[in-house]
A protein has these predicted regions:
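A short interface-forming secondary-structure element
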Residues: 62-73
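Short beta-strand/turn micro-motifs composed of small residues
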Residues: 65, 98, 164
Length: 166
């Protein structure tokens, strides 16, 4: 699939918040998410706001800005953080990553709400340690949940080489 992002239009915050509300409601109704505390809340590439993803890791919200042209909208990240803080009572931190930033700290993430990100997640009875600020990505991919479940069910007790590291 090829994504064409040549022209980025400014989106009105109310339109984005409406998209976030719809996606949050759908995620909360998804029974497969009851067995995990790490999942994607919003995938802008597919849900109407290319260049923005929002993930939930235990009690931390991770906002990832993939396209620097989205950074021109002042206050947008604050609006996003406020929306989720109001709608997810268990949330105690919001981390913002700007993938294209020249500043390493922004690529690895800055806290815009709370003091520190979560350091572990649980999924299908397995606990995973994580450091959300170690790299420019999260180092744990919620979208591969079904693959991890399959590996757990089919390769229990086997030695597995992790070829997903870089």
């Amino acid at each position: 699939m090829r994504l064409h992002l040549e022209r980025i239009e400014e989106i009105k915050p109310e339109k984005l918040l409406n998209l976030l509300e719809i996606c949050l409601r759908l995620r909360m109704e998804d029974p497969s998410l009851k067995l995990t505390d790490a999942f994607r809340l919003f995938d802008g590439f597919y849900e109407g706001f290319p260049g923005l993803t929002i993930d939930f890791y235990a009690q931390t919200l991770l906002i990832t800005e993939h396209d620097p042209r989205r950074a021109t909208q002042p206050g947008l990240h604050d609006d996003i953080a406020r929306f989720y803080v109001e709608n997810l009572p268990e949330l105690n931190g919001v981390l913002l990553k700007r993938r294209a930033s020249k500043a390493a700290g922004e690529r690895k993430g800055i806290m815009i709400f709370g003091e520190r990100p979560s350091t572990s997640v649980a999924e299908n009875g397995v606990n995973y340690a994580l450091d959300l600020q170690l790299n420019q990505d999260a180092s744990f991919y919620p979208d591969t949940r079904n693959l991890r479940l399959w590996l757990h069910q089919n390769l229990s007790g086997a030695s597995v080489l992790n070829c997903f590291a870089y």
